Each structure stands twice: as structure tokens, then as C-alpha cells.
Design a protein with these regions (language model features):
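C-terminal and inter-domain tail/linker signature
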Residues: 1-141
């Protein structure tokens, strides 16, 4: 994995951990987020509002990168897979669920398509079922 990939991915997850001003450096303006969160606008502007919403729902929001799989070609373009754990305390409403004050952890798997040093598309999957269990909104057994 090249340093540029490490820097790009590190900056992205620093941005989603509460510094949306960093998005301009890593996402194209017309970035595709697949799937969009209900109500999310497309593009980099939609990512900004999503990050702001997550910041209202979680205090201490932090994405910890656990693994990066760089499958780009020699030209630097292609896919990068990232596995993270998202930590935060549920202090604001999310998905219609009132704040619980509980510390939570969600695992994510993201696949970023990189073209010319910027992310043009992201496919993502979060383990929201475990989050619902952690905040007491879904049975854990």
C-alpha cells in the first residue's frame, strides 16, 4: 500500500470522525455514496450533512481503521477496501431512537473507488443491527 493511499484513507476517516472540512481533499464533488442514507443528498455536500448529523447523534464519534486492502492498479486507480470500528456515545436522536447515553461500537466495511487520487464512489455496509441491540432497541438473543 502506498503512502498516498494511507494518507487518503486516513484523511477520509478523520473527516467522517467530525472534520467534514477535510472532505474536499479526498472526495470528488459528485462522489457517489452507495447506498444513500434515507434523506441524504448525493455528492460531497451530502457527505457533509451526514457527518454533521452523526456528530449530533454521537459524542466522541471516532472511526478506527483496522484494515486497508489496496487493490488499485499500477496507475493508482481502482478499489480500496477498508474495515473500521466506529465508536461513540449515543447522545442524540438517530433513526428515531432517543439518546440513551450508551457507549456503542459499530463495525463497517467500505469499498472506495479511487480515480486520479480522489474517491469517486463508496459502497458501504454498517452493522446497524448490533447498534440497535447496544442501545436496547432490538432483542440481543
Amino acid at each position: 500500500m502506498s503512502t498516498s493511499t494511507s494518507d487518503l484513507i486516513g484523511t477520509l476517516y478523520e473527516a467522517v470522525s467530525g472534520k467534514p472540512e477535510l472532505l474536499d481533499a479526498v472526495l470528488t464533488e459528485d462522489w457517489e455514496d452507495i447506498p444513500l442514507v434515507p434523506g441524504q443528498q448525493p455528492g460531497r455536500a451530502g457527505a457533509r450533512s451526514l457527518i454533521e448529523g452523526l456528530g449530533k447523534a454521537f459524542s466522541g464519534l471516532r472511526f478506527v481503521v483496522e484494515e486497508i486492502i489496496d487493490a488499485r492498479g499500477d496507475d493508482g486507480n481502482g478499489m480500496v477496501g477498508v474495515r473500521t470500528r466506529v465508536h461513540g456515545v449515543h447522545t442524540g436522536e438517530l433513526f428515531g431512537i432517543a439518546p440513551t447515553g450508551r457507549a456503542t461500537e459499530v463495525r463497517t466495511h467500505d469499498f472506495h473507488q479511487i480515480v486520479d487520487g480522489r474517491i469517486v464512489r463508496t459502497h458501504h455496509m454498517e452493522d446497524w443491527l448490533s447498534w440497535l441491540q447496544q442501545v436496547g432497541s432490538w432483542p440481543s438473543n
